[in-house]
């Protein structure tokens, strides 16, 4: 195997060996032997040995109920260890620096070599960099927080073992620690006992900030500064921090009745409390380090006689006292106590920034730049990135909730039923009320619980410290009145500033109408005055793909963005496109660099705002070094997209995409919506029903408890198909459409699109990634074990379709095998398959036993149920995504 991966393979093998020793110590030699036999059979089966494949199936089918859980846990834990080794490999000196900060240097050199770009243009593009990452809880990190922490510790051990100068006794110590951590993981229950609450999810987000981003962001800025100095002779200004973090945890109430106004209020306080806690740690360090005496007259004037002997320390101690007073007040508020605000309560970033920056300027002026640019600079940058709120919150709610609230208000006032009015009448009413000086809400009126909740949420926004709430996102937005309605409700709550309100267009029809909706809004004078030249629009990836299939959805997303960019440019509006991508391909996920460069020209000029979801947060920001790599990749992609924009697609390419879109959507919906066998097949061939039992996120899996595929959220829909390895939502319809266009004699045109148009080549690359993870024999095995014989023909049809799709994509890409241009990912999938395959076979067996017990009216066997949950978590680790 490729030399490049030998370090990764040896780490994986070493971790596997330690896990084996742990299993032997815990359960005895016979269980370890059983696990080893299964592993060897799986490896041989993967290499094409049919006899061993049959033996693998028989061995797993014959496991007793007592053996199920240990075997499932062994393979699941191994995959977590393999993922940890892989994450370390991506940042280790021996790894393929697939995500190394070097990427910025490469991009800057590439830009400097462009004849029509000069240093001043590149510098201007750097100064306008803006990257906002929005952390969301779903599709939900399936791995428990306690295990994530242990994985981080294991990563540190691998780092120490990589040091060639390590002494033997130190190596023994590190190995002992590694054994302890793997044993701790083995003896920890990997499945949560209950669903996390929205507050638990928010705390998980804060833990990511504390354990990784807090150190990762300043490190990234140092790296960026170094590369800019080296390549452009340009230093980043101290107050320039192009990256910020926002969270949906505790703010996203779309379809989640557990996120209430009170929860949002609580999470806002908790977030501020965590910020004071982290800044206090920074200030403790600065109090200890800034013992210098020399200071500028300005600083001495600031500290007065009292602080003249140690001016920096004096200022830091005063700031520490303010932070402590703020923290105490926040603690009391979190306990429900109403206390008067203390003098000096920290509510704005400037209050933190000013004393720190005064110290920085004085140190620089007194020739102590080396000290100024140490811990102090890192803290200043954290103030700019995180500040008093730590992370800002987005509020998200579905459009119909606002319509229903206004309907209830208008009916009470006796002026008609807002819900039944035409769009023109709704707009006329909303604009009249927005311009009116009198309040709309009647006094002493008792609204329904749902309406009260909507109004209370608006009140929380109005009362929150300015800057702690980033935007109000309206899901399932369809009309201009959906946006105006939110502005009116916020006005009624007494909001004193222009809150960005972002419509989220997420079905195929809504994406196609997005430009019309925004054009109508921008033609309203009142609205133009309110937004002051800035507009945010969110593009939904997951629901549009679930609605129409990935090919039609991705083309609709591209066209919607393209039209919005042109409309806003013409109107002189600065547009920020907010990308609601998922981690998986079926929900719009793609390697960051490729995905950004495949967007329409101009789409990143207003900066990048993108959701980072669930388990992807750990893969991309789980460690400070990985954070540096991920932020560097985003930075280089934004610079490249803005300075070397992709070409406008030729008209003939657009026509082909229109054709592909129509055929793929018809094919996709023909199966998913119109084939009467499809829903029963889906329910039996995947663990969709069992997934509902997994205590994953705080959000219910369905928008409506009854109903078919359309009522399922995009996440369980993808998750279920990922589990049985058919990966259906991520490819269905795409290959059929490509095949039809090839048959029409346009293969050479498709090849040109693949070569010269990043949008199209990224689509094909994403299909290849999905095909690499899909597995025909496993999908077939699920059918044989779980599906009624009458439905077998449908399963066979879908698998045949998948096989044909793979051939057509390889033909267009001119490749002999999948992932030819990304060997690192192919290697990674190959490495994990040996461990994922037994989990898939075992899962099918467990689903069979579990359903049989249910059919017989017996109570479920807890050993089977627990082992099933472990296989679901294990396959998710093997596939590197949940939904």
UniProtKB/Swiss-Prot annotation:
Keywords in alphabetical order: Carbon dioxide fixation, Lyase, Magnesium
EC assignment: 4.1.1.31
Gene3D superfamilies: Phosphoenolpyruvate/pyruvate domain (1.20.1440.90)
Catalytic residues as annotated in Swiss-Prot or TrEMBL: 138, 546
Highest rank taxon of the organism: Bacteria
Cofactor: Mg(2+)
GO MF annotation list: magnesium ion binding; phosphoenolpyruvate carboxylase activity
Enzyme superclass (EC): lyase
GO cellular component: cytosol
Biological process, per Gene Ontology: carbon fixation; oxaloacetate metabolic process; tricarboxylic acid cycle
Catalytic activity, reaction form: oxaloacetate + phosphate = phosphoenolpyruvate + hydrogencarbonate
InterPro entries reported in the protein's UniProt record: PEP_COase, PEP_COase_bac/pln-type, PEP_COase_Lys_AS, PEPCASE_His_AS, Pyrv/PenolPyrv_kinase-like_dom
NCBIfam families: PRK00009.1 (NF000584)
Family classification: Belongs to the PEPCase type 1 family.
Role noted for this protein: Forms oxaloacetate, a four-carbon dicarboxylic acid source for the tricarboxylic acid cycle.
Protein name from the UniProt record: Phosphoenolpyruvate carboxylase
Organism the protein comes from: Salmonella paratyphi A (strain AKU_12601)
Taxonomic classification: Bacteria, Pseudomonadati, Pseudomonadota, Gammaproteobacteria, Enterobacterales
């Amino acid at each position: 195997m490729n030399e490049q991966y030998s370090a990764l393979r040896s780490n994986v093998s070493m971790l596997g060996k330690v896990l084996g020793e742990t299993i032997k110590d815990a359960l005895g030699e016979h269980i370890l032997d059983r696990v080893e036999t299964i592993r060897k059979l799986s490896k041989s089966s993967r290499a094409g040995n049919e006899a061993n494949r049959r033996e693998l199936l028989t061995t797993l089918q014959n496991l007793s109920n007592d053996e199920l859980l240990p075997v499932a846990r062994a393979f699941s834990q191994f995959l977590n260890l393999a993922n940890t080794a892989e994450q370390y490999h991506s940042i280790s000196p021996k790894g393929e620096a697939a995500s190394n900060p070097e990427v910025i240097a490469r991009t800057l050199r590439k830009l400097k070599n462009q004849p029509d770009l000069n240093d001043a243009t590149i510098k201007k593009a750097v100064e306008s960099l803006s990257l906002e990452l929005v952390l969301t809880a779903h599709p939900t990190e399936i791995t428990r927080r306690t295990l994530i922490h242990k994985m981080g510790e294991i990563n540190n051990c691998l780092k120490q073992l990589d040091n060639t100068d390590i002494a033997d006794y130190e190596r023994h110590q590190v190995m002992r620690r590694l054994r302890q951590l793997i044993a701790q993981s083995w003896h920890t229950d990997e499945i949560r006992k209950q669903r996390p609450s929205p507050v638990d999810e928010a705390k998980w987000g804060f833990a990511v900030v504390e354990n990784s981003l807090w150190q990762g962001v300043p490190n990234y800025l140092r790296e960026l500064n170094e590369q800019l100095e080296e390549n452009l002779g340009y230093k980043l200004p101290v107050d320039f921090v192009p990256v910020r973090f926002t969270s949906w945890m505790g703010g996203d109430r779309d379809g989640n009745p557990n996120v209430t106004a009170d929860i949002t209020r609580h999470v806002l306080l908790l977030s501020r409390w965590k910020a004071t806690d982290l800044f206090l740690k920074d200030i403790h360090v600065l109090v200890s380090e800034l013992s210098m005496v020399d200071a500028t007259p300005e600083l001495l004037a600031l500290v007065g006689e009292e602080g003249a002997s140690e001016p920096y320390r004096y200022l830091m101690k005063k700031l520490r006292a303010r932070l402590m007073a703020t923290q105490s007040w926040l603690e009391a508020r979190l306990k429900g106590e109403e206390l008067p605000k203390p003098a000096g309560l920290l509510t704005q970033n400037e209050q933190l920034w000013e004393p720190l920056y005064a110290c920085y300027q004085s140190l620089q002026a007194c020739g102590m730049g080396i000290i100024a640019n140490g811990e102090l600079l890192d803290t200043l940058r954290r103030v700019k990135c995180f500040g008093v709120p730590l992370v800002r919150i987005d509020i998200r709610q579905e459009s119909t909730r606002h319509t229903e609230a206004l309907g209830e208000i208008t009916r009470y006032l006796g002026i008609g039923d807002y819900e039944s009015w035409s769009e023109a009448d709704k707009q006329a009413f909303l604009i009249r009320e927005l311009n009116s000086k009198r309040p709309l809400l009647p006094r002493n009126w008792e609204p329904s619980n749902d309406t009260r909740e909507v109004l209370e949420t608006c009140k929380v926004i109005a009362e929150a410290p300015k800057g702690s709430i980033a935007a109000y996102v309206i899901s399932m937005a369809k009309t201009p009145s959906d946006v105006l309605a939110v502005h009116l409700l916020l006005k009624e709550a007494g909001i004193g500033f222009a809150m960005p309100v972002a419509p989220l267009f997420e079905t195929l029809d809504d994406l196609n109408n997005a430009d019309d909706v925004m054009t109508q809004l921008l033609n309203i004078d009142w609205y133009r005055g309110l937004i002051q030249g800035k507009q945010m629009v969110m593009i939904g990836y997951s629901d549009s793909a679930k609605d129409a299939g990935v090919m039609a959805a991705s083309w609709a997303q591209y066209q919607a963005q393209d039209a919005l960019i042109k409309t806003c440019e013409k109107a002189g509006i600065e547009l920020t496109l907010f990308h609601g991508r998922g981690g998986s391909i079926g929900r719009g996920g793609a390697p960051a660099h490729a995905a950004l460069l495949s967007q329409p020209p101009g789409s990143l000029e207003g900066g990048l705002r993108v959701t980072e979801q669930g388990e992807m947060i750990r893969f991309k920001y789980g460690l400070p070094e990985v954070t540096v790599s991920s932020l560097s990749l985003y930075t280089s992609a934004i610079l490249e997209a803005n300075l070397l924009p992709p070409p406008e697609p030729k008209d003939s390419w657009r026509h082909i995409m229109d054709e592909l879109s129509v055929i793929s959507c018809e094919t996709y919906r023909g199966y998913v919506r119109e084939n009467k066998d499809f829903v029963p097949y889906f329910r039996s061939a995947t663990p969709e029903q069992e997934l509902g039992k997994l205590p994953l996120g705080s959000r219910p899996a369905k928008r409506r408890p009854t109903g078919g595929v359309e009522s399922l959220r995009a996440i369980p829909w993808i998750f279920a198909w990922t589990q049985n390895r058919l990966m259906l939502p991520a490819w269905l319809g795409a290959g059929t459409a490509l095949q039809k266009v090839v048959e029409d004699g346009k293969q050479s045109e498709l090849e040109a699109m693949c070569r010269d148009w990043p949008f199209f080549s990224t689509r094909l690359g994403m299909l290849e990634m999905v095909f690499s993870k899909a597995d025909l024999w496993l999908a077939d095995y699920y059918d044989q074990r779980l599906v009624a014989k009458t439905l077998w023909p449908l399963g066979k049809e879908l698998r045949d379709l998948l096989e044909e799709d793979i051939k057509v994509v390889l033909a267009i890409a001119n490749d002999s095998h999948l992932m030819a241009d990304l060997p690192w990912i192919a290697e990674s999938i190959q490495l994990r398959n040996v461990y994922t395959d037994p989990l898939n076979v075992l899962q099918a067996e467990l689903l069979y036993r579990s359903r049989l017990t249910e059919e017989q009216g017996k109570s479920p066997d807890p050993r089977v149920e627990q082992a099933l949950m472990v296989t679901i978590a294990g396959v998710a680790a093997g596939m590197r995504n949940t939904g």
